[in-house]
Amino acid sequence: MSTVVIIGAQWGDEGKGKITDFLAEKAEIIVRYQGGNNAGHTVVVDDAEFKLHLIPSGILHPEKLCVIGNGVVIDPQVLKQELDSLAERGVKTGRLCVSQRSHIIMPYHRKMDAVEEEQKGEGKIGTTKRGIGPTYTDKASRVGIRVVDLIDKEEFPKLLKNNIECKNEIFEKLYNTKGFEYEEVLKEYQGYAEMLEPMTEDVSVLVHNAIKEGKNVLFEGAQGTLLDLDHGTYPYVTSSHPTAAAACLGSGVGPTKINRALGIVKAYTTRVGEGPFPTELNDGLGEEIRKNGNEYGTTTGRPRRCGWFDAVIVRYAARISGLDSLAITKLDVLSGLPVIKLCSGYRYKGEIIREFPASLKELAKCEPVYEDFPGWSEDISNVTRYEDLPENAKRYLERIVELTEVKISLISVGVKRSQTIILEDLFN
């Protein structure tokens, strides 16, 4: 039996979908434990591309049980669209189950997200406007609607009526915009209740029993550590916790049940939305990496900001989640660059610092301290053994290990499952 947690160790978009899909072959259960449809996981199977936002990436493996845990906020409209899209492409989705305790994204959450972001003006966060933040806000305020509430034919209408009355007052009096019609929302979400009810499970019991029976369980995270509500670049963060600890909270299992934490990192760094980014490349090279890496958001389509690998943030993420090893993705994107830079620390007020600062004001004044590495010209997209990588690529990877103090278990050199170099079997 082995339990592995997948964590993004940068600002999200690290390639967690591909790695989850790759590791799902040896797992029996795949659990999404936080976030919502603000996630965008791209998986390629036999040249067919699948883009998933809510459903675990393991769904593309027949016979694997896929679970949406209580830490995830669910937009049933998006869930239905994903299920329908997968079914149209011949993917069986009857192996999906949803936690009774997951909170539901309502139409007023999506509208609140958009209105509040607009009100911020120049201080905008860069939200996806999917209603994620307002749903977590209602959860913390104890007025949210859970799956178990949605499928309760007596309770749901009462909860919805109270919430719509409250939200409409805010929309109309504070934001001078129209609210929602109770009957319309009720009818729509009663339909979603019928869809969700057969999938509903006590996920904590299900996952606990699976671990007890010796099954391999893979916990799939969304976003990245630097977007964590507590440990990220606040306030430019998400509303959940993309860290290893959240796998326990978001699925209902104890921390002693987790065996390994795998951090996913690109061979460079990207970020979507606002906020500081010390190694960002605002030049033609950044555009070249964006083009070669196809760096556009799966969820929003927004171009990602690109920069050099930052060992400071990855070492920070490793400490926060207790990472056992790393999976390096998109190493192939760096092929052809004459020089590759790696950030080993920051220069702040004339001194070199190695730890990630909490203050964004301080972070904005930090200058990256770079180490230069000669690049490689070889096409590495079909390399399957570490020994066959160019020497310069191996030296670059070895330095990443030294600076982050975390070993490498997997290296991805392309989007396909076959384009993966295995250094260690994570389920042994």
From Swiss-Prot:
Per the record, the domain of life is Bacteria
What Pfam families has UniProt attached to this entry?
Adenylsucc_synt
SUPFAM superfamilies the UniProt entry points to: P-loop containing nucleoside triphosphate hydrolases
- Tell me, in one coarse class, where this protein mainly resides: cytoplasm
Gene3D superfamilies with a match to the protein in the record: Adenylosuccinate Synthetase, subunit A, domain 1, Adenylosuccinate Synthetase, subunit A, domain 2, Adenylosuccinate Synthetase, subunit A, domain 3
GO MF annotation, one: adenylosuccinate synthase activity
Q: In which pathway does it act?
A: Purine metabolism; AMP biosynthesis via de novo pathway; AMP from IMP: step 1/2
Cellular component terms per the entry's GO annotation: cytoplasm
Q: Where is the active site?
A: 13 (proton acceptor), 41 (proton donor)
Identify the EC number(s): 6.3.4.4
Example GO biological process: IMP metabolic process
**Keyword annotations from UniProtKB, A to Z:** Cytoplasm, GTP-binding, Ligase, Magnesium, Metal-binding, Nucleotide-binding, Purine biosynthesis
Q: Which residues bind IMP?
A: 13-16, 38-41, 128, 142, 223, 238, 302
Q: How is the cofactor bound?
A: Binds 1 Mg(2+) ion per subunit.
Q: Which cofactors does it use? A: Mg(2+)
SMART domains for this protein: Adenylsucc_synt
Concerning PROSITE patterns, the annotation shows: ADENYLOSUCCIN_SYN_1, ADENYLOSUCCIN_SYN_2
Summarize where substrate binds, as residue positions.
298-304
What's the catalysed reaction?
IMP + L-aspartate + GTP = N(6)-(1,2-dicarboxyethyl)-AMP + GDP + phosphate + 2 H(+)
How does this protein assemble? Homodimer.
Q: Which family does it belong to?
A: Belongs to the adenylosuccinate synthetase family.
Q: Which PANTHER family match?
A: ADENYLOSUCCINATE SYNTHETASE
Protein name, entry field:
Adenylosuccinate synthetase
User: Source gene?
Assistant: purA
